[in-house]
Amino acid sequence: MQSLAVTIQGEGPAVLLLHGFPDRSNLWRHQIDALKSDFTVIAPDLRGFGESDRPDDVDAYRVGKSVGDLLAILDELGVEQAHVVGHDFGAAVAWAFALSAPERLERLVVLSVGHPGVPIDFEQREKSWYMLLFQFEEAEELLRRDDWAFLREWVGTHPEPDRVIADLQRPGALTAGLNWYRANRHPRRELDPPREFPRVTAPTLGVWSTGDAYLTEARMTGSAAFVDDWRYERLDGAGHWMQLDKPDEVSALIRTHLC
């Protein structure tokens, strides 16, 4: 198991909060404050991010490996079941958790990213152009060039770009973050036959924000076909990082679904 930095606050039923790229657990600070009065909030820095280990092997960043990390955290804390809330790559991990360890899941909340079985249409492929760029070993050099000018433009809707860049400037951090794309979004996976997924049986809330520059609404709404108990909320006036753009609204949506 990798060494992970984990923030734990509050008492009550356990809730895992899972961030994505290029963030760390403090992305959830507003939601932690809103939930800790009624829940034990567990917010890890996923492997490669924040203060957690940054393994060298690309395959170490497969989402299934992070599911294993989460199960180990719950086992260490003596938690049988938890609610799981994920955003961006954290949402991909949350879906994988629901599919591979349904007996450990109470309720699921996914922000921005829909079920992996939803077909990828042309609009989504256009928005996902950067995933191909990140496969190349020169990507790190391009992103760092001219005081991170390319990255600053790419994360232009992030409310905290300087914090993100400070994180990625640490030794090995940028490569670790890009390895999530190299491990899980490699173009060769387009040639794999369609996967059969078990039904998601946990009550699931999907939230998509109208200002998301990276994910389409159809990717989220299409998740309904794979979930037994599905609820969808469309959040107006927020970008991809809705936890920071609309913290009170996001916290209220999560709390309403979990309570």
Write out the residue ranges for each language-model feature:
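Conserved HGGG/HGGXW glycine-rich cap/lid loop of the alpha/beta-hydrolase fold
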Residues: 7-56
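Flexible "cap/lid" subdomain of the alpha/beta-hydrolase fold that forms the substrate-access gate
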Residues: 4, 14, 49-85, 89-234, ...
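Two-component system phosphotransfer/interaction surface
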Residues: 251-255, 259
